[in-house]
Structures are given as structure tokens and as C-alpha cells.
Amino acid sequence: MESLASLYKNHIATLQERTRDALTRFKLDALLIHSGELFNVFLDDHPYPFKVNPQFKAWVPVTQVPNCWLLVDGVNKPKLWFYLPVDYWHNVEPLPTSFWTEDVEVIALPKADGIGSLLPAARGNIGYIGPVPERALQLGIEASNINPKGVIDYLHYYRSFKTEYELACMREAQKMAVNGHRAAEEAFRSGMSEFDINIAYLTATGHRDTDVPYSNIVALNEHAAVLHYTKLDHQASEEMRSFLLDAGAEYNGYAADLTRTWSAKSDNDYAQLVKDVNDEQLALIATMKAGVSYVDYHIQFHQRIAKLLRKHQIITDMSEEAMVENDLTGPFMPHGIGHPLGLQVHDVAGFMQDDSGTHLAAPAKYPYLRCTRILQPGMVLTIEPGIYFIESLLAPWREGQFSKHFNWQKIEALKPFGGIRIEDNVVIHENNVENMTRDLKLA
């Protein structure tokens, strides 16, 4: 395998090319990219956890250091001012020397407010990309050049096409997340609480709870019916029925986003339904290829959901086609089939059809779908179908012409299990689809 250093060198060359194109198109001289700043909790001197600007970490794997600045013009070596204060109160990251520092000019920045004296004097034609517009104004950046929409749309669109360096980082993130999922399943099987399962996951991945790319969803029993359940009960459940884990990891700023669901027993209807959702998810991935709309795969999975609802007699006396047409599958899978993945968990440009930012919204029938792109080589997406038993979504169907088709007794029996979600991360290649998750033998 090519070294990360050589992959990074090619990655920077790609980013430089994209930057040249964007600067030419929007008549700018350079981009000033800000890592971000710490923001204090209201009426407190304690800051919120730092989250780096994703456009910053696209260039350098510096994810924990505020007050850093990148100046890029697509031609000269990128210049990084790395915040290096004299501070005995807080940990100070040393000036980096790593696989990537040969390709970036790294300069120590001892004072956060010292950046102004180090930037080019002429700043009227520099674009600022970052979370603190008032800082850009203080530095003399034109208001019209602060987070310019055209530039950001352009950069976001091409972020969909991952470089080999980015794919290498994402495969490493997968390994970490897979370790976490295995540890969490073991903790579940031993009867631990959600809180303790989460600790086991974080320990196995080497993350703090502020390091993971999103809040871990550690859901036992009926909690699996809450799509983004993040409460974490401290008490172990008296009866373990089911466990849904949606949790990822991050490597050099790139995310993994995996979900698995386990049944406590292997011989009940719920366990069979978990197996069937898993099989249908793999079957869908086997059909995926470049040149097809992501929306098509979402719609196809609703047809697969209909097949499972019929097989398990959750919906009866209705064809699979009629179930999808009348949206009887909707309350059982109330989210999209997945989303783009990369520097962000819900990565950018899911609706962009070109580098001008042309927006194609999700279909009216499926407004929660996060991607309407035609799949192309280099894209990374999640495939995460589910079946849930959510009373607020089922309640409207308890009356009306379709109520008789719902096997309410079966649904009541399944509600204590919450739901099921199975999520893999896939890469679209020219002639195949790589399943990064299954390649690591995560069942």
C-alpha cells in the first residue's frame, strides 16, 4: 500500500487544483481558512468542546487546535499558522512534524490576535472561510468575501469525490469503529447498562465522548425506536431484548458511521427480522453502481421493506407494490437510506447537481432523504435501512381504510424491541462498490 505521506502529497495537489479553479472563477487571489475559536458557555468561563472547521481539516489533519489559519492560493505551498501559545493553564499541542508537514509551511503563532501582522498587507481580494465572520472583518477582509457562497458551493461539490488519501483515512476510521462495535456487543451480552456499554465503546476506539464524530446512539430495548437516542441510562435493563448501536470514529478528521442491531435471543421473530433486514441491506448494496441516482436505491429499499412486512405478517392482505404506493412502508422506515460521508458525518453537497450549487431536493414523498446525487466514482455513502415500531408514526394508521392491513397484535409484540437499523459505509468505484465495513468482517 502507498504510504500516507505520498497519498497526502497527491491529496494536496488535488486541493490546490480545486483552489486554483475556484479562485479563477470567483476572481479571488487566495483563501484564508480559519480552524475556529473556542466559545464560552453563556455566563461562564468554561468553553464548549472545540469542533474544527471542516474546510480547514480538509487540508491538514489538525482537529483539536483553535486559532490556526491556512492561506492557500492554489500555486504556492499552503501556509499554516499553528497556534502555539505560552500557557501553563492548558495543554499546548507541539508544532507538528508528521507525514504531512513536508507539504505545508508550518509557522508558530504564539498569540491568537497576532495573525493580522503576518498576513499579506493587501487583503481586499482574499476570501475568508470560517466560523467567526467578525474576526475576518477585523482583519480587513471584505464583507462580500466572507464565506462566499459560490466558493463554498464549489469546494463542497468536489468534496464528494474522495482522494486516495481520504479513502485511506476513512478505512482507518472504519477499523476503530469496528473495534468499538465488537466491544459494545460483548458489553451488551454481559448485561451492562447503556452508559457502561458506551464507556466500553469509547475505550475500544480510543475516543473521548467529545472526539467521536457524532453522539453515540446506544439504545437498549424500546429505546431503539428513537432514531437519535442519546440519553444513556445508567441502570442496566432488567430484561435485555434488543440493542441498537449507531456509533462511529474519526481518523485524521474523517468519519466512520456504523450501525448494528442485535437480538438478545436468537430464536424469536425479532431476531429473524434483524437477519432479514441485514440480508436485504447486503442485497441492495450488491446492486449498486456508478451512474444511478441515490434516490432510486432509497425507493428500492422501500420495496424490500414491503417484502419483509409481508413475510413477517406485519402487513397482511396487500401487495408489496400497494404498500409502497400508499406509503404503508413509511412509518416503519421514516428516514433516508443514508447520506454522504467524509469530513462530516452528514457530509456536504448531498443535493448539489453541479459545481455551481444547483439544488435538487429530496422527493416530496421522502423529504428526509439526505442525498439526490447520481452516484459517481470516489463518492462515499452510508447505506442504513431500518424497520422501527414508533407509536407516534403508527398512530395515524390505526384508523382509516388501511388499518385492517396492519397486524396490530404483531406490532404490539415487537414494540418492546424498538427497532432495527443496519448501516455500512460504501465507496463507489468505476466498476465496483467497496463495502469498507464488511471488508473488516463486521457481521
Swiss-Prot record:
It catalyses: Xaa-L-Pro dipeptide + H2O = an L-alpha-amino acid + L-proline. It holds the Pfam family Peptidase_M24. One of its GO terms (molecular function) is phosphoric triester hydrolase activity. InterPro entries: Creatin/AminoP/Spt16_N, Creatinase/aminopeptidase-like, PepQ_N, Pept_M24, Peptidase_M24B_aminopep-P_CS, X-Pro_dipept-like, X_Pro_dipept. GO terms for cellular component: cytosol. This is Xaa-Pro dipeptidase. Mn(2+) 1 binds at residues 257, 339, 384, 423. The gene is pepQ. Keywords: Dipeptidase, Hydrolase, Manganese, Metal-binding, Metalloprotease, Protease. GO terms for biological process: proteolysis.
